[in-house]
Amino acid sequence: FPYQGSSIILESGNVNDYEVVYPRKVTALPKGAVQQKYEDAMQYEFKVNGEPVVLHLEKNKGLFSKDYSEIHYSPDGRRITTHPLVEDHCYYRGHIRNDADSTASISACNGLKGHFKLRGETYLIEPMKISNSEAHAVYKYENVEKEDEAHKMCGVTQNWESYEPIKKASQLIVSTEFQKYMEIVIVVDHSMYTKHKGDSDKIKAWVYEMINTISESYRYLYIDIIVSALEMWSEKDLINVETSAENTLKSFGEWRAKDLIHRISHDNAQLLTATDFDGPTIGLAYVASMCDPKRSVGVVQDHSSVNHLVAITLAHEIAHNLGVHHDKSSCSCGSGYTCIMSPVINSEVIKYFSDCSYIQCREYISKENPPCILNKPLRTDTVSTPVSGNELLEAGKDYD
């Protein structure tokens, strides 16, 4: 990169080696087309390592449910529910033109922010805080100074040594009947609300970026992830959030069954917290529990300033709910890649579920037939690309 040795503080942390780029929009709208604030498809051109690339983006139209709501609380404890218009949102997925293996998950709300894969390397992009400038920083994730080199793990401890897959992934026939739809509620607890200084717009952007990232991973499991609601415990926690991930998970599941499930239509709920769970644990979820009122839940620690790392922890925990276990060494998601269901989170950028996860998810769905994910919900846009999903287990600083 041109600025080797330079250091800059960006949202992901201190970056030692970055490139300044000026993305140029190259999309031409068809004649007579109505100009949306955020088009359905966009292309941007910029240089990476001196070479021009074209980033092709398509809006993630299935991101929000038709009756999407946001909930927060007034100082006197009243619940305030709004139904914001989210049709014209700014969350995209895509690829680099002429690179068959490339992927991208980008928010275009204020400049381009997110990550893309180019020639096997993962890059992050974000706007630079320079007034009246289109300057963006592009950098490899490996050049972000890591906050904490300690291993982080999922708290789920079930093993599947006795598990012998009946079929290889290549033998599973995939048809449209395999497509499933998971409506999810994200609950942000008071510690996370406070960590982000009570800035609800910032919190929403942080959460939406995560869901946009994991929806891409779940496409390969033929599961659509759709956000039904975002609830922020803006005044105080509605459960006792403890440093014990196990106790917090139990309390959250009980609260969902007695409260949340009666006021918001959804299939699964995940709690995001800034509470530092005991030991290396950064997440926890029940295994094979999708659609159960108390157990279709997970808890995830907001453990990194890199959005992608927290997103993958969220994806991991949801997959446990879908009957997916931690990967063994024989599981693979491509040469040299760490997979989402690795029990330990290291400092690599992870994007894919393994062949084992795919088989376990499909077999769980075919055997258990969890009813809540069979219906195709109304969305802000009925056109949607298949998204795959696995169940996730607890996520922790280490995945046990």
Curated annotation (Swiss-Prot):
The UniProt keyword set, sorted, is: Calcium, Disulfide bond, Hemostasis impairing toxin, Hydrolase, Metal-binding, Metalloprotease, Protease, Secreted, Signal, Toxin, Zinc, Zymogen
Q: Which domain of life is it from?
A: Eukaryota
Q: Which residues form the propeptide?
A: 7-176, 378-400
Q: Name the residues annotated as catalytic in the UniProt entry.
A: E317
Q: Which cofactor does it need?
A: Zn(2+)
- The answer to whether keyword Disulfide bond applies is yes
MF terms in GO: metal ion binding; metalloendopeptidase activity; toxin activity
Coiled-coil portions? none
- Does the record bear Calcium in its keywords? yes
GO CC annotations on file: extracellular region; plasma membrane
Q: Which N-terminal stretch is annotated as signal sequence?
A: 1-6
Task: Give the Enzyme Commission number.
Answer: 3.4.24.-
Residue ranges annotated for the Peptidase M12B domain, each copy included: 180-377
Note the InterPro entries from the entry: MetalloPept_cat_dom_sf, Peptidase_M12B, Peptidase_M12B_N, Reprolysin_adamalysin
Cofactor note text: Binds 1 zinc ion per subunit.
Task: Return the SUPFAM superfamilies for the record.
Answer: Metalloproteases ('zincins'), catalytic domain
Q: Which residue pairs form cystines in this protein?
A: C291-C372, C331-C356, C333-C339
* Protein's cellular compartments: Secreted
Residues that hold Ca(2+) 1 according to the record: E183, D267, C372, N375
Q: Which GO terms describe its biological process?
A: proteolysis
What does the tissue specificity note say?
Expressed by the venom gland.
Q: Which residues bind Ca(2+) 2?
A: V387, N390, L392, E394, D400
Subunit arrangement? Answer: Monomer.
Q: Which family does it belong to?
A: Belongs to the venom metalloproteinase (M12B) family. P-I subfamily.
Tell me what this protein is called.
Snake venom metalloproteinase H3
According to its UniProt entry, this protein's organism is Deinagkistrodon acutus (Hundred-pace snake)
The organism's lineage?
Eukaryota, Metazoa, Chordata, Craniata, Vertebrata
